[in-house]
Design a protein with these regions (language model features):
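N-terminal secretory signal peptides
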Residues: 1-8
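Long, histidine/aromatic-enriched segments associated with O2/redox biology
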Residues: 12-31, 39-425
Length: 425
């Protein structure tokens, strides 16, 4: 029995009650740049779904979901045709799963009885829960470390897909850095996100191998004005000044690659930077509130700048404090990261909290899995991170242990596949 869609149950509705109708409205703004009517918002949060095909890949301006499974793959020693075949298979499976369907042609409990199921089945009763699946290509997909043109696409590597520099203070683990291909699966149910990566990994067997992956929870940014600003594991509101889907002019300027931006195949796409940032939780928890707020440059409760106002009041970096020094310290995070002090540089943040248990000393292995999308990393992330790495007061409480960059192509047309213009135009 063919099955394009799982049987959807309301069993998970109560656990997903936090997915508000407002998130559905934000989804319409992100995808179509105009808010849908109320009838477009599903009564059951588990039924929330976003189109897979379109001008842009979903999972960028889509309202940030609550859960993440991020996976990075290295492509095996295969011919170009096999890489294209993998991308085609991934596209078909991702499109099905994003609509609440099976990864394969048959549902997990259907198909040939003496063959392995085409879908692992753990998401059968959960619904799509807002699942988005976003694909990206790393620098090493274009050119190997020894300079080899692996798949005949070295001359099509975009100028903006630079090798990220090693920033001051970086303590990078190469095992969780870099990579040929990335998949970002976001959903409001963690099992749905894990199911997506699990099945795409299974489909890749013999063609690409999992290099590393990361689970995330509690989004640390809002990509829609319908969403409240979340908090990171330091307890502060995070991403107050983030780009929002409801400002399409700013998104066009800072996120989407234009036709004239170098490689035409990247039009409608973006560049993704990932950074795994471990927080020194225990020292932070023993730090005075006054020092915490000084390091951030905002109040812990309401997220207002120390210069006054509410969360969304523009910081006054010239306002004097005690002793005549600026009330927002010169090394405060908000000052160093703010667009006003970075020549207007902006990016769309889409990060998540993570907790990977404890280390051997009993310290919490936790922090921020930072994700950001931008039109050109050399004009946004790289200069901003260079400033932060140099003097941010938060550096005492953080360690950057993973780093990667990916070219995220524009969305696929139905019947085509993600990245088709790279290989076929």
């Amino acid at each position: 029995m063919a099955a394009d869609t799982f049987r959807i149950s309301r069993r998970r509705a109560l656990s997903l009650a936090g997915v508000s109708a407002a998130a559905g409205v934000g989804a319409g703004v992100a995808a179509g740049r105009s808010a849908p009517d109320a009838s477009a918002v599903p009564a059951d949060p588990a039924a929330l779904k976003y189109p897979f095909y379109g001008e842009h890949q979903a999972g960028i301006t889509t309202p940030a979901q609550d859960r993440l499974h991020f996976a990075v793959f290295d492509v095996d020693d295969i011919p170009r045709e096999e890489l294209i075949s993998l991308l085609q298979d991934w596209t078909i499976a991702a499109a099905r799963m994003s609509q609440g369907g099976s990864a394969g042609e048959f549902a997990p409990d259907a198909g040939p009885y003496e063959a392995p199921p085409e879908d692992t089945g753990e998401a059968m009763d959960l619904g799509p829960t807002g699942l988005t699946i976003t694909f990206g290509f790393g620098p090493t997909l274009f050119t190997a470390a020894d300079g080899t043109d692996r798949f005949g696409i070295a001359d099509r590597r975009p100028r903006a897909l630079v090798d990220l520099p090693r920033f001051s203070g970086d303590m990078l683990d190469e095992r969780i850095s870099g990579g040929d291909l990335c998949i970002q699966a976001c959903a409001d149910d963690p099992q749905v996100a894990v199911h997506a990566i699990r099945n795409l990994s299974r489909i890749a067997f013999g063609r690409a191998s999992l290099r590393y992956s990361q689970l995330g929870f509690g989004r640390t940014s809002s990509t829609s004005t319908a969403q409240v600003t979340p908090r990171n594991l330091f307890g502060f509101k995070d991403g107050t000044a983030n780009l929002k889907a409801e400002d399409p002019a700013a998104v066009d300027e800072h996120v989407w690659v234009a036709d004239s931006d170098d490689q035409a195949w990247m039009a409608g796409g973006s560049y993704l930077v990932s950074r795994k940032i471990r927080m020194n939780i225990e020292p932070w928890d023993r730090t005075r509130l006054s020092e915490q707020e000084r390091a951030i440059g905002r109040t812990k409760g309401h997220g207002a700048p120390l210069s006054g106002g509410d969360e969304f009041t523009a910081p006054d970096f010239s306002m004097p404090g005690s002793g005549g020094k600026p009330i927002i310290a010169e090394q405060a995070h908000v000052r160093l990261a703010h667009p006003d002090t970075n020549g207007g540089a902006r990016m769309l943040r889409r990060g998540y909290n993570f907790v990977d248990g404890n280390d051997d000393l009993g310290r919490l292995n936790a922090g921020l899995f930072f994700l950001c999308f931008q039109r050109d990393p050399e004009r946004s992330f790289i200069p901003v991170q260079t400033r932060l790495a140099g003097s941010d007061l938060l550096n005492e409480y953080t360690r950057h242990v993973g780093s990667a960059i990916f070219a995220v192509p524009g969305g696929a047309a139905e019947g085509s596949y993600v990245g088709a213009r790279l290989f076929e135009s």
